Swiss-Prot record:
Catalytic activity: Release of an N-terminal amino acid, Xaa-|-Yaa-, in which Xaa is preferably Leu, but may be other amino acids including Pro although not Arg or Lys, and Yaa may be Pro. Amino acid amides and methyl esters are also readily hydrolyzed, but rates on arylamides are exceedingly low; Release of an N-terminal amino acid, preferentially leucine, but not glutamic or aspartic acids
Cofactor note: Binds 2 manganese ions per subunit.
GO annotations of cellular component type: cytoplasm
PANTHER family: CYTOSOL AMINOPEPTIDASE, LEUCINE AMINOPEPTIDASE-RELATED
EC number: 3.4.11.1, 3.4.11.10
One GO-annotated biological process of the protein: proteolysis
Organism: Mycoplasma genitalium (strain ATCC 33530 / DSM 19775 / NCTC 10195 / G37)
Protein name: Probable cytosol aminopeptidase
Pfam families listed in its UniProt record: Peptidase_M17
Residues given in the record as Mn(2+) 2 binding sites: K218, D223, D241, E302
Matching InterPro entries: Leucine_aapep/pepB, Peptidase_M17_C, Peptidase_M17_leu_NH2_pept
Record bears the keyword Metal-binding: yes
Molecular function GO labels: manganese ion binding; metalloaminopeptidase activity; peptidase activity
């Protein structure tokens, strides 16, 4: 993306014009004042979707007059929203300018954008261009085939990406996980020839704050279902089961690159879930890192197992004061919220309100779903362990999974983000929630 270096006069220019709502129009010598569409002034998720759809149709050079958008907001009663509008435009542009991963011999051409804006907004533009770059990093890893991306490769990718940033990286290898007695993560890993990993990326930039936000990501680099193997269409796209890990790690690097004064750590639980000769089976009982025993009812409910140990690690070993996990956890989300909203579960109303504000500022639609002790009861019916990892009981499967995770938070507030229906759309990774997590961590910097 170019800043204040417009393309030639023959290029289209996008300006934002005022009406009862906001319109986006193109202006070019050969095609003047052609209206593209309208976007409600404060509906930033809709604004984001409209801009992305518009930019993806463009395969040419395009100038965007950001000053026209700023003036539009300043003249309106929603003048306080123009910073969010700028963020939305910049992250939409970086999303559309790049194809993060492709193995095509002739890659498709993307739009090239030059942004025109006043000097006083350059820092804001550059900040969110960086956020967009790390959204694209998450997308790149999401789209990479699982034969090229497994736990060891995932770790190396982030070690390289973080090499010049003020972060600390710690990698718990298989032997470390055994010493720690992370039985749930190790149990899922039993069927794979490749070892599990727990990747920890720490960024501490606010010594005056006692708050530490932990982002925990599910990193199943391929999910076959294990011994409860998936069939047909249910296995297609399971390379995206590591999306949560890619998203949380990318977010921490974005915060570090922009030197946001906050304390945050990413924890990525990495393994494959395969039906090898040594794979765990239904009826096995595993001991979690927090000491609880878990009976395996279904090996395809593996995400909550690896997350459970990672959440406990964030609470006990890293002294997190707030935990947010991101995971492609339950396929039911596609029926509940489709690809429009990400489902959010929270043990704390106050933390939910802060998260909702962050999502609004990021222009990402989220919807809170319920947690209730009744949802956990079917998982407590086992006579042989403290919990089962799943049940044949009908209804509220996504809420039940969230309640299972809450059993491992060690008293720390937990927000669970189920991105099963929003992580990838039309077989392309979206880097969903990188922007929201960035905004949430930035909120703590402003306290």
């Amino acid at each position: 993306m170019r800043i204040n270096k417009p393309f030639s006069d023959d290029s289209n220019t996008v300006v934002f014009v005022s009406s009862k709502t906001y319109g986006v129009k193109e202006e070019a010598a050969h095609n003047p004042n052609v209206e593209f569409g309208v976007v409600l002034p404060t509906d930033f998720p809709a604004f984001n979707r409209a801009l992305v759809q518009f930019l993806k149709r463009k395969k040419t050079k395009l100038n965007i007059n950001l000053d026209s958008l700023i003036e539009l907001y300043k003249k309106n009663e929603n003048s306080g929203c123009f910073h969010t509008a700028i963020k939305t435009v910049i992250t939409s542009v970086t999303f559309c300018e790049t194809t993060p991963f492709t193995m095509k011999t002739k890659p498709e051409k993307n739009v090239e954008v030059a942004v025109q804006c006043a000097v006083e907004y350059h820092n804001l533009v550059k900040e969110y261009e960086t956020v967009g770059e790390y959204v694209n990093l998450a997308r790149e890893l999401q789209d990479t085939p699982s034969d090229l991306l497994y736990s060891e490769v995932f770790v190396k990718h982030f070690e390289k990406a973080a090499s010049k940033l003020p972060v600390k990286i710690k990698v718990l290898k298989q032997s470390d996980l055994i010493k720690k007695k992370m039985g749930l993560l190790l149990g899922v890993n039993q069927g794979s020839e490749r070892e599990a990993r727990l990747l920890v990326i720490s960024y501490q930039a606010n010594k005056n704050s006692k708050e530490k936000l932990a982002f925990v990501g599910k990193g199943i680099t391929y999910d076959s279902g294990g011994m409860n193997i998936k069939t047909g269409d249910y296995m297609r796209g399971m390379k995206y089961d590591m999306s949560g890990a890619a998203i949380v790690c990318s977010t921490v690097l974005a915060l570090a690159k922009n030197k946001v004064k906050t304390n945050v750590v990413a924890v990525a639980a990495l393994t494959e879930n395969l039906p090898g000769a040594k794979a765990q089976r239904p009826d096995d009982i595993k001991i979690a890192y927090n000491g609880k025993s878990v009976e395996i009812d279904n090996t395809d409910a593996e995400g909550r197992l690896v997350l459970a140990d990672a959440i406990t690690y964030a609470a006990k070993d890293l002294a997190a004061t707030h935990i947010i996990d991101v995971a492609t956890l339950t396929g039911l989300m596609s029926y509940i919220l489709s690809t429009t909203y990400t489902g959010i579960f929270s043990t704390c109303d106050h933390q939910w309100e802060s998260f909702k504000k962050a999502a609004c500022s990021a222009g990402e639609p989220v919807w809170r779903l319920p947690m209730h002790p009744d949802y956990l009861k079917p998982l407590q019916l086992t006579k042989l362990a403290d919990l089962q990892n799943s049940t044949s009981a009908r209804g509220a499967g996504s809420s039940r999974a969230a309640c299972f995770l809450a059993e491992f938070r060690e008293g720390v507030s937990l927000i669970h983000c189920d991105i099963a229906s929003t992580a990838s759309i039309e077989n392309l990774g979206q880097g969903v929630l990188v922007r929201t997590l960035y905004e949430r961590a930035s909120q703590l910097a402003n306290k």
